Curated annotation (Swiss-Prot):
Alphabetical list of InterPro entries matching this protein: 2-IPM_HCS-like, 4OH_2_O-val_aldolase, Aldolase_TIM, DmpG_comm, DRE_TIM_HOA, PYR_CT
Annotated ranges, domain Pyruvate carboxyltransferase: 9-260
Binding site for Mn(2+): 18, 199, 201
Active site (catalytic residues): 21 (proton acceptor)
Protein name listed in UniProt: 4-hydroxy-2-oxovalerate aldolase
Similarity remark: Belongs to the 4-hydroxy-2-oxovalerate aldolase family.
Amino acid sequence: MSNSNRPAVVITDSTLRDGNHAVSHQLRASDIASYCQWAEAAHVPIVEVGHGNGLAASSLQVGLAACSDQMMLETARMHLKTSRLGIHVIPGFATVAKDLKPALDLGVDVVRVASHCTEADITERHIGYCRDQGKTVFGVLMMSHMAEVPVLCEEAKKLEAYGAEAVIIMDSSGTYLPLDVTRRVSALKESIGIGVGFHAHNNLGMAIANSIAAIEAGAVLIDGSIRGFGAGAGNAQLETLVAVLERLGVATGIDLYRVLDAGDFAETLFVKELPVVRSLSIVSGLSGVFSGFSKPVLRIASENGVDPRDVFFELGRRRAVAGQEDLILEVVKEIKSRGNR
């Protein structure tokens, strides 16, 4: 079965980027090569590849990747012919000269330049460079729940002014309910003259429902990952997303049978542990803390005899964001100290 009409919604498959969080950034070149062939066969429009935190993020602080950026991108490029190769770029991790230029030289087609939801200013140079090189470039606002709707709209306007061709909001901690998504996507549609996209996490079990709410509110770019493979409780499951959109009559251009096959294959290859909405995932969603914190929080809390739920709620009170993993140990020590008094 195929959904071959002109896509009404363009889906980005983040399996090989967000999914890297689920395996501590240890996806191998062979995993990337094999999965890209399946995604290509399913006619997935955009396949995003890289370290979980994006280009040049491999580090002791957020996790060392099994493969270099160059190896990951070269491998993917070799196997993607019609599907476009995408990357996630956070200024601060990736510089234009040292990281972005070499990535584009390797054949990247789509660049998603991301910032915290109130810091769009840092994306200007990266977005401008991508536009100058003739690449498709989207602006991304991470942890979007941390900004009020008017602030989110103002940040989106900046991305548009810098040259972004669309603005994608990320529910990085999986905290949204469908009404939250509808309000934000609708407001963005009214505020900017470019496309709006949405990236879901499943911490409260709402990834598919939230993605559909985004589309109904006018989003034209939606992210998903095979088997929901991603940080924390995972992302919107790509196969389910395609099936539901087919049921709704929304064209994606993705072959349903082949994406189902891709899911079966990925589960035998590298999705060794299927995403589950566990207790900590729910707490992550409620506290509004980045899903990727789940593993380090659990590990550090366990090592120190501290309840990881307390750690999440304290991180939420401190408005911790991705890249601030060093806060976890600080919070754990503080909670442990209070408990010993």
